[in-house]
A protein has these predicted regions:
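General secretory precursor processing signal
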Residues: 5-6, 17, 115-118
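Cell wall/extracellular polymer interaction/catalysis modules
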Residues: 26-187
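Short, positively charged and aromatic/hydrophobic N-terminal segments
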Residues: 21-23
C-alpha cells in the first residue's frame, strides 16, 4: 500500500512538471549590438536553443540588424506582437517593452493614430517629426537613416549603413514568429 502511494506521488510530480512546461512556452530572441559605425548600430539577432530537458544549449543565428544611433531602443526585454501597421499597410513585428506598471509608452493604436496624423500634416514638408515618433518595430529596409524611433532593420549587414536581402530575411523572421504565436508561445527579444 505504501509503495503505491509513492508511485502516485512520483507520477503526479512528473505530470505537473510536464504540464508546467507546456503552459509556459516562450521563444526567446537575443539582439546583440556589435559595433557603432558612422551613426549606425550593427547587431546580430539569434534565437535561444534549448535541449529536451529545457537547458539552454546555445544560440542559433537568424539575421543581422541595423539601427539608427540616435533612435535606438534601450537595452531590455521586449514582447513581440504582430499587428497591422497603417504606414506600411501590412502586418509588422511591433516591440512592446516589458516593464513595471509605471511604463510611459503609448499603446499600439494611439501610436498608429499619431503616425497617421503626422503623415497627413507633413506630406509635402519636412518629415523630421514623423521620424521622431516612437514606433518600435522590426522591419525590412535598405538603410537605417529614415527609420523612426525604435525601428530595427532586418537583413544582412554589409557596408556601413547598407542592408541586403532585407525583405527575404524579414519574411523568414515573420513566418517564424507567426508560427510560434499560433502554437501559443510568447515571443520575447532581449536587447543587449
Amino acid at each position: 500500500l505504501r509503495s503505491e502511494n509513492v508511485k502516485v506521488n512520483v507520477n503526479f510530480k512528473c505530470f505537473s512538471i510536464v504540464v508546467f512546461k507546456l503552459l509556459h512556452v516562450m521563444m526567446k530572441l537575443f539582439l546583440n549590438r556589435l559595433r557603432r559605425d558612422h551613426g549606425v548600430i550593427v547587431g546580430r539577432l539569434s534565437q535561444e536553443v534549448a535541449n529536451r530537458q529545457g537547458i539552454v544549449a546555445g544560440h542559433q543565428y537568424i539575421c543581422d540588424t541595423m539601427e539608427r544611433e540616435g533612435g535606438c531602443l534601450e537595452p531590455g526585454e521586449y514582447h513581440i506582437m504582430v499587428a497591422k501597421c497603417k504606414c506600411f499597410a501590412r502586418q509588422m513585428l511591433f516591440l512592446e517593452p516589458i516593464r513595471d506598471d509605471s511604463s510611459s509608452s503609448l499603446p499600439l493604436p494611439e501610436t498608429c493614430k499619431l503616425c497617421r496624423m503626422e503623415r497627413k500634416s507633413h506630406e509635402f514638408g519636412c518629415l523630421e517629426e514623423l521620424y521622431a515618433l516612437p514606433c518600435p518595430m522590426m522591419q525590412p529596409g535598405n538603410g537605417p537613416f529614415r527609420l523612426r524611433q525604435g525601428g530595427i532593420l532586418i537583413g544582412e549587414a554589409h557596408a556601413s549603413g547598407v542592408v541586403l536581402k532585407s525583405q527575404e530575411r524579414f519574411l523568414q523572421l515573420y513566418d517564424r514568429m507567426k508560427k510560434a504565436m499560433v502554437r501559443g508561445s510568447d515571443v520575447v527579444v532581449v536587447i543587449e
